[in-house]
Amino acid sequence: MDVFLTHGCILFALRCCILSSNLVSSYALADINRLKSEGLDIRAAVASRTDEPHWARFCMDHLVVEDGSTLSSCFGNLVEISYNDKTHHFRQLHKKTGIPFEHMVFFDNEHWNIKQVSKLGVKCIYTPDGMMKKHWEEAKTEFGL
């Protein structure tokens, strides 16, 4: 599941990690909460390609982040879960947020997704071993955060 985060006209994407049966932990989510507390307008969104969208939503409703909220509650209406490819998800998120593709960053562990999404003008970061702190820091630096 890919998570997209917006800061003004910037859209970030990261991969969450599950540490235990239902606790989701991510330094990036913690960092986002910190940036929000500093007054930055940051919104989060999810894009997931699956043939089981109902199951993915069920999981999001039951996974809990470190502050006790569900994963679903972190993203509001910015959830794109379907069998469509990532470019469809990005187009839908663009429609919902108005954020230009050129102001987006996308992390993914599949070359195909990186190749396709980059054609939209999105900055893509390949994460073969999953989202790591260095990837998050690279994206923040890229956008001056």
Predicted regions and their residues:
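Asp-based, Mg2+/Mn2+-dependent phosphohydrolase catalytic module
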Residues: 87-105, 110-145
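Alpha-helical substrate-recognition element adjacent to the catalytic core
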Residues: 1-84
